[in-house]
């Protein structure tokens, strides 16, 4: 796969390359190619904000609805349990997501990309006890010891080659990291497609070219 990656890099200069690297095996090559290596781990200086959103895409599906769906799935992972989120919990999460993105959706100049903590704080404002249950589960990832996803994005996600390293994560945190990584990859592929750019995605030694 590394040989194919290098071949794509050298022969198809317009294409983008995205790598999800569980063991950090691709990181040295990506650095040599001048790409962006992002190490997702507690204490890492690199951060991807799961609340990032691309609102200006001319797509069939609303970016806000897609982000709400992603955050519902994220909260489901965080809350856990065999039954997942209950209908009322899904309703209050969806409501809060739309509230915290309201300024961005309206195109206000003062609008800022929210953080996970903004969702947490909005949940605490809701009257339903179910909202507090979800907020309590999120607390660990906002103000607790696993707050690595509660930061603004500080890496170049638009680099031609991006390698996300998931080495050193526990099982639960790895599931959340993979969910956030998959959301980034899906979003990047969509943006690239709209710009007429093909994307090569590498997961666990398997590659797939996205051209649509």
Question: PLM features: residue spans?
Answer:
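P-loop NTPase motor domains
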Residues: 27-35, 42-44, 49-208, 212
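Glycine-rich phosphate-binding loop of nucleotide-binding enzymes
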Residues: 1-42
């Amino acid at each position: 796969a590394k040989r194919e990656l290098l071949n794509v890099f050298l022969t198809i200069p317009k294409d983008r390359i995205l790598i999800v690297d569980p063991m950090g095996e691709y990181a040295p090559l990506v650095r040599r190619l001048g790409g962006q290596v992002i190490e997702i781990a507690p204490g890492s200086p690199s951060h991807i904000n799961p609340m990032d959103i691309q609102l200006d895409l001319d797509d069939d599906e609303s970016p806000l609805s897609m982000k709400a769906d992603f955050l519902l799935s994220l909260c489901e992972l965080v809350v856990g349990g065999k039954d997942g989120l209950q209908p009322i919990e899904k309703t209050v999460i969806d409501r809060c997501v739309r509230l915290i993105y309201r300024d961005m959706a309206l195109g206000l100049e003062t609008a800022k990309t929210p953080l996970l903590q903004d969702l947490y704080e909005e949940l605490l404002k809701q009257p339903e006890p179910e909202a507090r249950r979800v907020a309590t589960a999120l607390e660990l990832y906002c103000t607790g010891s696993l707050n690595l996803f509660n930061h603004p994005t500080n890496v170049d996600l638009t680099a031609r080659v991006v390698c996300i390293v998931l080495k050193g994560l526990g099982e639960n945190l790895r599931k959340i990291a993979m969910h956030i990584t998959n959301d980034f990859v899906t979003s990047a592929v969509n943006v690239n497609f709209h710009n007429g750019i093909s994307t090569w995605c590498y997961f666990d030694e398997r590659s797939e070219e996205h051209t649509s």
